[in-house]
Every structure is written in structure tokens, then in C-alpha cells.
Curated annotation (Swiss-Prot):
One of its GO terms (molecular function) is carbohydrate derivative binding. InterPro entries: Etherase_MurQ (IPR005488), Glucokinase_regulatory_CS (IPR005486), MURQ/GCKR (IPR040190), SIS_dom (IPR001347), SIS_dom_sf (IPR046348). This is N-acetylmuramic acid 6-phosphate etherase. PANTHER family: GLUCOKINASE REGULATORY PROTEIN. Homodimer. Specifically catalyzes the cleavage of the D-lactyl ether substituent of MurNAc 6-phosphate, producing GlcNAc 6-phosphate and D-lactate. It comes from Trichodesmium erythraeum (strain IMS101).
Length: 307
């Protein structure tokens, strides 16, 4: 690793020539400048499309074989990983263990700045050991500037356990190189406020994590068309969404959809299979289990298919 005390060469630390007069702009000019600069995030995602697709495929394979997905980061990068992981259970009805976020400083760092904790390579390495990482798992190291010791300690620990590794950063390989399975470079350029990587770097990182986690869940069969058929029904909003999905896909009335959802044990996926195949709940559960929860695959192998 390069000398961590000298980071001025990194793209994320450089001065943005478009914002040299940032403190003299009107509020509207500030908004317009942010809007203009944020367009770089879309370009960065487009430039990394092949690597992102590779990450989706590799992670899908790992999770389908019993592995887990771990995001590791410090500061903003760590919080974004925790955020994405926390959204998977309600969106895709996954267990909290399937996708996890590991942040330097633990839960306290989610609420209070803990920048000093990112400098410990050993803490990152120990975090991997404490989570019992195996060769079935995928570790995503997230560091906007590329050099965070905590993240590199975690990645090294992952490699020692033969886990798959993904690196997400906002600096080019010429400025910082690393050996991982998938290397994703989201080059959004210098920040409007020099060095404040919670801005464009944070935005583009969230976009990449959105693509990774959602892409994996789509590939695992937790989506039918563009419908959230594995939604965990935990409140009235999500129950309404579940009922609307059933209504839209089956043309049942609201009351009929409610009855079907109740019979399925509040599983949209199972409710749809029961309706389309005339299977009872127990048999539907068995069929879905046989096809690893993939509704479309199950429907191709039962009678009364809608295909």
C-alpha cells in the first residue's frame, strides 16, 4: 500500500476546478452546480457495467450455494453498506444473516463519526474472523479513496479464508491497485467540496450497491417480472403492496386477493403459485422449495401454468 500519510495524488482528494468559487455562489447556483456534477455518477456506473455484472453473477452463484454477502467499510462507505444490507429483509424476505454490513466502529459509528477507527488494519481483519467467513461467502470492500486500512484488513482476511472478494472505489487503478476477484472503479472525479467523499463518491457507491443487491435477488428468483413477490409483510403499507401485486397479476378483486394471501400465510409468491396452479399451501410450499423459491421456474413445471 502507498504511504497513507500522503494521499494528495488520489482522485478523491484533488481540487475540483468547477467549484473554486463555491463559497461565493448563490443557493440556486449551488443547486445547479451539484446537479451538473452529479451527472458524473451515471457515467461512472455505465463505465463499470461489465464489472458490476460480473459481481452480480459471482455473488448470485455464491448465495445459491449457501454463501453470504458482506459489505465492509468505514464512515460513509460503511454506512452505505449497512443501509443496503438492512433493506434486503423487508424487500426480499431474506434472513438478516444473508446480507450483512460491517462498519468500522460497529453500531455506534452509524450515528456518530468514527473516522479514527478506519486506520486499523487489524480491526478489519478481526471483523472477518468474528463473522466466521468461509469460502462460500462474498466480501465487498468499499473505500472511496481506495486506501482505508480497515477495509484492506478485511479483504486480506477474506482471501485467507478463500472467500470471493469485490473492491469498490472511486480512484483509478493507476493510483491504487489491488488483487481481488472483481475490481469496480467508479470514477466520478474530485468532489465539489474537496475530499468530501460523502458527495459524488457516496452517491455512486449507493447506486452500485443498489445494482448489486437487487441484481442478485432478481437472479435468485425473488422477483417476478418487476414485482416484489418476496416482500415481507410487516406493516399496513407492505400489506397493501402485497395485495396490489396479487390483484394486478391475477385480476382478482381486493377481497379475493386478501383471502388468497391469508391462505398462503402472507406469502405473495406462494399465493400466486396457489392461484395459478390450483395447488394447496403445503404442496405449493414443497414445489417452491424444490425450485429454490423461484416462482417462474416452479410455474414451468406444474400444471395450469400461465406461460
Amino acid at each position: 500500500m502507498k504511504n497513507l500519510q500522503q494521499r494528495g495524488h488520489l482522485l478523491t482528494e484533488q481540487v475540483n476546478p468547477n467549484s473554486h468559487n463555491l463559497d461565493q455562489l448563490s443557493s440556486l447556483e449551488l443547486v445547479d452546480l451539484f446537479n451538473q456534477e452529479d451527472k458524473q455518477t451515471l457515467k461512472a456506473i455505465a463505465s463499470s457495467r461489465l464489472q458490476l455484472a460480473q459481481a452480480v453473477d459471482m455473488t448470485t452463484k455464491a448465495l445459491s450455494q449457501g454463501g453470504k454477502l458482506f459489505y465492509v467499510g468505514a464512515g460513509t462507505s460503511g454506512r452505505l453498506g449497512v443501509l443496503d444490507a438492512a433493506e434486503c429483509p423487508p424487500t426480499f424476505c431474506t434472513s438478516p444473516e444473508l446480507v450483512q454490513g460491517i462498519i468500522a466502529g460497529g453500531a455506534n459509528a452509524l450515528l456518530r463519526s468514527s473516522e479514527d477507527l478506519e486506520d486499523s488494519w487489524e480491526d478489519g481483519n478481526e471483523a472477518i474472523a468474528s463473522h466466521n467467513i468461509t469460502n462460500l461467502d462474498v466480501i465487498v470492500g468499499i473505500t472511496a479513496g481506495g486506501t482505508t486500512p480497515y477495509v484492506h484488513g478485511a479483504l486480506e482476511g477474506a482471501k485467507q479464508r478463500a472467500a470471493k472478494t469485490i473492491f469498490i472505489t472511486c480512484v483509478p487503478v493507476e493510483q491504487f491497485s489491488i488483487k481481488v476477484d472483481v475490481d469496480i472503479r467508479l470514477l466520478v472525479g474530485p468532489e465539489l467540496l474537496s475530499g468530501s467523499t460523502r458527495l459524488k463518491a457516496g452517491t455512486v457507491t449507493k447506486m452500485a450497491l443498489n445494482i448489486l443487491s437487487t441484481g442478485v435477488m432478481v437472479r435468485l428468483g425473488k422477483v417476478y417480472g418487476n414485482r416484489m413477490i418476496d416482500v415481507a409483510i410487516k406493516n399496513s403499507k407492505l400489506r397493501d403492496r402485497a395485495l396490489r401485486i396479487i390483484e394486478d397479476l391475477t385480476e382478482l378483486s381486493r377481497d379475493e386477493a386478501e383471502e388468497l394471501l391469508n391462505k398462503s400465510g402472507d406469502s405473495v409468491k406462494l399465493a400466486l403459485l396457489m392461484h395459478w396452479s390450483n395447488l394447496k399451501k403445503e404442496e405449493g410450499d414443497r414445489v417452491l422449495s424444490e425450485y429454490q423459491g423461484n416462482l417462474r421456474a416452479a410455474m414451468k413445471n406444474v400444471s395450469f401454468s400461465t406461460e
